[in-house]
Curated annotation (Swiss-Prot):
Name of encoding gene: MT-CYB
Main subcellular location of this protein, as a coarse class: mitochondrion
Protein's name in the database: Cytochrome b
Subcellular location: Mitochondrion inner membrane
Domain of life: Eukaryota
Function field: Component of the ubiquinol-cytochrome c reductase complex (complex III or cytochrome b-c1 complex) that is part of the mitochondrial respiratory chain. The b-c1 complex mediates electron transfer from ubiquinol to cytochrome c. Contributes to the generation of a proton gradient across the mitochondrial membrane that is then used for ATP synthesis.
Gene Ontology cellular component terms for the protein in this record: mitochondrial inner membrane; respiratory chain complex III
Residues noted as binding heme b b566 in the record, renumbered to the chain: 97, 196
Binding site for a ubiquinone: 201
Database matches in Pfam families: Cytochrom_B_C, Cytochrome_B
Family recorded in the similarity comment: Belongs to the cytochrome b family.
Organism: Akodon siberiae
Lineage start: Eukaryota, Metazoa, Chordata, Craniata, Vertebrata
Membrane topology reported for the UniProt record: Multi-pass membrane protein
SUPFAM superfamilies linked to this entry: a domain/subunit of cytochrome bc1 complex (Ubiquinol-cytochrome c reductase), Transmembrane di-heme cytochromes
The protein's assembly and partners: The cytochrome bc1 complex contains 11 subunits: 3 respiratory subunits (MT-CYB, CYC1 and UQCRFS1), 2 core proteins (UQCRC1 and UQCRC2) and 6 low-molecular weight proteins (UQCRH/QCR6, UQCRB/QCR7, UQCRQ/QCR8, UQCR10/QCR9, UQCR11/QCR10 and a cleavage product of UQCRFS1). This cytochrome bc1 complex then forms a dimer.
């Protein structure tokens, strides 16, 4: 078997990626979230496949088909809630994974980092089109509001929106194409994830110390396979607790009402994992400015390798930037909270301050703190 896994054309790839892969001996539990994202993706594809067998992408029957899945299909309620809460677990792991990358300076591996940003955007797109499918009130109005933002693009905006809708409003054509997108995008994510891994294994993994670990590598199996299995067990435990005890805690009550184009909900808001970006969008009074800020809130991640001027790798020995980093995390939580609040004083003002702080920390404060720390080293 030892010879087979090293010589077989297919098993050789698996062997070099997951068994004999030389791995730094000191990577912590923060490095577990890559494998957890892989598990989340598998769970989402499998549960989604079973849901797609019973779902109908028609405006007249979509809401009823989701109710039918929950009531009449064997364990349909479980599959549906595993899928809905699995998306939340996916984004929790994704945010921690990106946060770890920023903290430990993983953006130095620029190819891996840039593919990661594409993965992040693709996952957000998948979650957005998926949220429209149950065809509840928040699904319908969320789709209307977010797709309508494209009308802010000069000259081609209105045409583009009608092209995406497949008509003059969000209707049957929109739901059908969103279902098609939601079905195909996870497989595109899987392909990008493989490319992400390919680039990572070209350079080798980063480690908490930020130092070169070539002299101290251990095989991935059994050390990190066991460690990953523990992480997977904990992830599944949290997911099952969510799905079985608190299935609707992260959802929106408005989505229990079928979509009605004639009745607008009091507060239109997306799922919790988009609230930070939604708060940034709402904090700018101009429509086009808001859309640009929304896009930049994610694309600014690509600036990290360019703005990094530090002579040290990661933040583990950099107290000044550490303080700024944790301020940034706190600011993200404030943005998430503001995104779920109504558009009125004082929430709008807090949102504007938090949005300015978000970009200021990344573009100005972090590079400045890097320079300060570089000068401290010289003393």
């Amino acid at each position: 078997m030892k010879i087979l896994r090293k010589n077989h054309p297919l098993l050789k790839i698996v062997n070099h990626s997951f068994i004999d892969l030389p791995t730094p001996s000191n990577i912590s539990s923060w490095w577990n979230f890559g494998s957890l994202l892989g598990v989340c993706l598998i769970i989402q594809i499998l549960t989604g496949l079973f849901l797609a067998m019973h779902y109908t992408s028609d405006t007249t029957t979509a809401f009823s088909s989701v109710a039918h899945i929950c009531r009449d299909v064997n364990y349909g309620w479980l599959i549906r809630y595993l899928h809905a809460n699995g998306a939340s677990m996916f984004f929790i792991c994704l945010f921690i994974h990106v946060g770890r990358g920023i903290y430990y300076g993983s953006y130095i591996l620029s190819e891996t980092w840039n593919i990661g940003i594409i993965l992040f955007l693709t996952t957000m797109a998948t979650a957005f089109v998926g949220y429209v499918l149950p065809w509840g009130q928040m699904s319908f109005w969320g789709a209307t509001v977010i797709t309508n933002l494209l009308s802010a693009i000069p000259y081609i905006g209105n045409t583009l929106v009608e092209w995406i809708w497949g008509g003059f409003s969000v209707d049957k054509a929109t739901l059908t194409r969103f279902f098609a997108f939601h079905f195909i995008l996870p497989f595109i994510i899987t392909a990008f994830a493989l490319v992400h891994l390919l680039f990572l294994h070209e350079t080798g993994s980063n480690n908490p110390s930020g130092l070169n670990s070539d002299s101290d590598k251990i095989p991935f199996h059994p050390y990190y396979t066991i460690k990953d299995l523990l992480g997977i067990f904990l992830l599944l435990m949290v997911l099952m607790i969510l799905a079985l005890f608190f299935p609707d805690v992260l959802g929106d009550p408005d989505n229990f009402t079928p979509a009605n184009p004639l009745n607008t909900p009091a507060h239109i808001k997306p799922e919790w994992y988009f609230l930070f970006a939604y708060a940034i969008l709402r904090s700018i009074p101009n429509k086009l400015g808001g859309v640009l800020a929304l896009i930049l809130s994610i694309l600014i991640l690509a600036a990290f390798p360019l703005l990094n001027t530090s002579k040290q790798h990661g933040l583990i020995f950099r107290p000044v930037t550490q303080t700024i980093y944790w301020t940034f995390i706190a600011n993200l939580l404030v943005l998430t909270w503001i995104g779920g609040q109504p558009v009125e004083y004082p929430f709008t003002t807090i949102g504007q301050i938090a949005s300015i702080t978000y970009f200021t920390i990344i573009i100005i404060l972090m590079p400045v703190s890097n320079t300060i720390e570089n000068n401290i080293i010289k003393l």
